[in-house]
Amino acid sequence: MALPSSFLVALVALGCNSVCSLGCDLPQTHGLLNRRALTLLGQMRRLPASSCQKDRNDFAFPQDVFGGDQSHKAQALSVVHVTNQKIFHFFCTEASSSAAWNTTLLEEFCTGLDRQLTRLEACVLQEVEEGEAPLTNEDIHPEDSILRNYFQRLSLYLQEKKYSPCAWEIVRAEIMRSLYYSSTALQKRLRSEK
């Protein structure tokens, strides 16, 4: 069952406010940027979901990454950063050459994601300086590799389907669901830490 875009936007906004309260200096505009990104992603839909039913796939969204035991804010920042980084890759590099997205919406979406990544990277650097985050690739949180594998499955699916319009629609919807779930699960986890 697909949730309405406005409902998803509201839930992501709640999750983003929790990310903003992690203690690093993420500006208040971070929540607004996330809401806008989800709205744009919803507006980018090109096909009705019913026309792509035969192409649906279970990508095994790693729910435990967002609901697991992440006791450090560095881990939470890392998960959010990797998620945004991978979404940026899909829509701002891979999609730009193989999907017929509305150019105006795509540019605004990519610009907003780029701003989010810049702000998240500043927070990750702050955590490194405070000794809370890993300095080397060998120290990457296991959640990061789980997320990378999830996004790799999405990428392989697009390749297998030869970047068809339905494949892109399935991936776009999957990423919207991922943003929705990650935001609500992350918010719940952060509230339990208070």
Swiss-Prot record:
Pfam families: Interferon (PF00143). Residues 1-23 form the signal peptide. Glycans are attached at residue 102. The keyword Disulfide bond applies. GO terms for biological process: adaptive immune response; B cell activation involved in immune response; defense response to virus; humoral immune response; natural killer cell activation involved in immune response; response to exogenous dsRNA; T cell activation involved in immune response; type I interferon-mediated signaling pathway. One of its GO terms (molecular function) is type I interferon receptor binding. Its main location: secreted. GO terms for cellular component: extracellular space. Disulfide bonds join 24-123, 52-166. SMART domains: IFabd. Gene3D superfamilies: 1.20.1250.10. InterPro entries: 4_helix_cytokine-like_core, Interferon_alpha/beta/delta. Keywords: Antiviral defense, Cytokine, Disulfide bond, Glycoprotein, Pharmaceutical, Secreted, Signal. It is found in: Secreted. Produced by macrophages, IFN-alpha have antiviral activities. Interferon stimulates the production of two enzymes: a protein kinase and an oligoadenylate synthetase. PANTHER family: INTERFERON ALPHA-5 (PTHR11691:SF60), TYPE I INTERFERON (PTHR11691). Belongs to the alpha/beta interferon family. This is Interferon alpha. It comes from Felis catus (Cat).
